[in-house]
């Protein structure tokens, strides 16, 4: 019998369109519908920038007048003035803008203006400017990207940025502040909009140029989280960003885009992608002020301002705990996207029970790009999804992408059903890291550009793909590859408790897996270890099981995007073992 190879090319995707042409759909279809709703900003927060709409023209929302709400018409007209203001200051198409701004109305205006003015945008969390350790990263970004424009929130960040700039060789820079700043050399964003109003530049010509944007122009540079290594710059082309929007039309659509809740900060790749995807469908981007915060999400749901939400597994667990003591109507939520970390069957089923009226799906994405998989299980119950043990699939190969599982031992495409390195090819994936860093992560073959993701994955005979974990997280125990996520999903199924598995050193086997559970109450750790071996085999024998409490931790440590920080868990485990 001939074994199928684990590679699928799903064929081309029509992508002959610019980013502005995509978001212009919302402007044309619903000019007076809300494009941006900021629950954490007052209704008059941008009155100094925005020309108020006629209240009879603008569609009203559940909390109209209580928070900032911009219509497509308001957003576009103001962004045009801002784009012209940039041009009046000598900022030409192809220039780079570094924005360090919180989620909110200013971010939305800057993003729309960058698309109109054809500027490359870089987003960084403004808190990093004020952090002595992270400010070094800002200096590196400035030196590596040489932006023509930098935008910060207020005087505090302006002073810090001046200090950082003083340590670089950058001298020519347009410095913009969202609020009034007395520091020399800084201009308020309001002044740029005023300059745009007074400038005779043909605004219609600017819009037409945006419609015909060069697909090879650099659209954005986002930086990887740097959880385990130095952050790498990911330069995404206009054509790649447009490809992502076209491919994700199954994810955010006319049905669920009315109020698409965006909690990730705009420095995370998921945020601008979701913003543009929502605008392309004529929906409203709903923003909150505290990142992936469960309370903020629930506030949005109570106000009926959340038809589309994004959850990480850690958030799903926190939300479930909250809803045990609080009753909230979740019927306004139409779609729940789960991702950010590996997703188990329990998490998917739990999300379905938390949001009984919603479609629950997984969407795979990376800072380097996305749109390589399509969730093909929307028409079936989450419990009937074809799981691999307790592991959820990421879907099947999406149109416009090719997926390959690579056998590193044999140096060939793996057979289906066998794990290997996940390699992806798509227009939506960057062609290289900034300045050619980690060049070995990319290769050219058969007329296609491939990206080595760093994930270990498996493809079934039906073409369904499962990501088993990160290559860097793989535990090599006595010469055998052990995937922590496989054990974590098994433990969560057996105990109902959130689990994290890390590697600890062993004098004979090199490494062995060690598990940390949210709680060990009503758990027989020895019996659980025996069950893990019985279900997964002797390669998965645990060196021990412990609870967060025993390690001196109260909660699972997560980063800004709610991904678990395993390095902190490992440090706590090693302290515990050394102290015994």
Curated annotation (Swiss-Prot):
Induction: The expression of the dibenzodioxocinones biosynthesis cluster is positively regulated by the transcription factor dibT. Pathway: Secondary metabolite biosynthesis. Gene3D superfamilies: 3.30.300.30, N-terminal domain of ligase-like. One of its GO terms (biological process) is fatty acid metabolic process. Its EC number is 6.2.1.-. InterPro entries: AMP-bd_C_sf, AMP-dep_synth/lig_dom, ANL_N_sf. It is an enzyme of class 6 (ligase). It holds the Pfam family AMP-binding. The keyword Nucleotide-binding applies. Keywords: ATP-binding, Ligase, Nucleotide-binding. SUPFAM superfamilies: Acetyl-CoA synthetase-like (SSF56801). One of its GO terms (molecular function) is ATP binding. Acyl--CoA ligase; part of the gene cluster that mediates the biosynthesis of dibenzodioxocinones such as pestalotiollide B, a novel class of inhibitors against cholesterol ester transfer protein (CEPT). The biosynthesis initiates from condensation of acetate and malonate units catalyzed by the non-reducing PKS pks8/GME11356. Pks8/GME11356 lacks a thioesterase (TE) domain, which is important to the cyclizing of the third ring of atrochrysone carboxylic acid, and the esterase GME11355 might play the role of TE and catalyzes the cyclization reaction of the C ring. Belongs to the ATP-dependent AMP-binding enzyme family. This is Acyl--CoA ligase GME11374.
């Amino acid at each position: 019998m001939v074994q199928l190879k684990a590679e699928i090319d799903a064929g081309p995707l029509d992508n002959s369109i610019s980013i502005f042409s995509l978001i212009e759909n919302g402007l044309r279809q619903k000019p007076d519908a809300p494009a941006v709703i900021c629950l954490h900003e007052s209704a008059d927060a941008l009155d100094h920038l925005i020309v108020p709409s006629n209240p009879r023209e603008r569609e009203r929302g559940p909390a109209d007048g209580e928070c900032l709400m911009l219509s497509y018409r308001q957003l576009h007209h103001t962004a045009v003035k801002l784009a012209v203001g940039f041009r009046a200051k000598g900022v030409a198409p192809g220039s780079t803008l570094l924005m360090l701004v919180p989620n909110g109305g200013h971010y939305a205006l800057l993003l729309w203006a960058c698309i109109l003015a054809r500027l490359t945008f870089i987003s960084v969390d403004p808190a990093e400017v004020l952090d002595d350790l992270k400010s070094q990263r800002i200096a590196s970004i400035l030196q590596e990207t040489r932006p023509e424009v930098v935008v910060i929130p207020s005087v505090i960040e302006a002073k810090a940025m001046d200090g950082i700039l003083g340590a670089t060789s950058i001298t020519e820079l347009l410095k913009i502040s969202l609020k009034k700043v007395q520091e020399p050399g800084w201009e308020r964003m309001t002044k740029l909009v005023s300059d745009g109003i007074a400038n005779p530049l043909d605004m219609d010509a600017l819009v037409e140029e945006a419609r015909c944007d060069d697909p090879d122009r650099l659209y954005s540079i986002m930086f990887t989280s740097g959880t385990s290594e130095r952050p790498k710059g990911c330069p995404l082309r206009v054509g790649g960003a447009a490809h992502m929007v076209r491919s994700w039309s199954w994810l955010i659509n006319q049905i669920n885009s009315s109020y698409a809740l965006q909690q990730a900060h705009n420095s995370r790749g998921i945020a601008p992608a979701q913003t543009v995807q929502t605008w392309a469908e004529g929906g409203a981007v709903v923003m909150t002020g505290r990142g992936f915060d469960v309370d903020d999400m629930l506030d949005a749901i109570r106000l009926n301002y959340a038809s589309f939400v994004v959850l990480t597994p850690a958030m799903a667990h926190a939300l479930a705990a909250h809803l045990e003591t609080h009753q909230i109507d979740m019927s306004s939520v139409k779609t729940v996207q789960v991702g950010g970390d590996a997703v188990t069957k329990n998490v998917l089923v739990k999300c379905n029970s938390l949001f009984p009226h919603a479609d629950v799906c997984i969407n795979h994405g990376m800072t380097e790009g996305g749109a390589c998989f399509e969730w093909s299980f929307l028409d079936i119950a989450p419990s009937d999804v074809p799981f691999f043990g307790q592991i959820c699939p990421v879907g099947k190969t999406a149109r416009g992408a090719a997926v390959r599982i690579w056998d590193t031992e044999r140096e060939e495409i793996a057979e289906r059903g066998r794990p290997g390195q996940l390699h992806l090819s798509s227009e939506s994936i960057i062609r290289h890291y900034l300045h050619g860093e980690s060049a070995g992560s990319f290769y050219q073959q058969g007329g296609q550009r491939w990206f080595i993701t760093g994930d270990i994955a498996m493809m079934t005979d039906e073409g369904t793909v499962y990501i088993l974990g990160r290559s860097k997280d793989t535990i090599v125990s006595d010469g055998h590859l052990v995937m922590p996520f496989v054990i974590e999903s098994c433990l969560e199924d057996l105990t109902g408790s959130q689990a994290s598995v890390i590697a600890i050193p062993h004098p004979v086997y090199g490494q062995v897996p060690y598990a940390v559970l949210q709680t060990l109450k009503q758990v027989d750790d020895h019996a659980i270890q025996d069950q893990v071996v019985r279900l997964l085999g002797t390669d998965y024998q645990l060196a021990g099981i412990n609870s967060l409490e025993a390690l001196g931790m109260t909660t699972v440590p997560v980063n800004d995007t709610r991904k678990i920080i395993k390095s902190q868990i490992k440090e706590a485990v090693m302290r515990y073992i050394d102290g015994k």
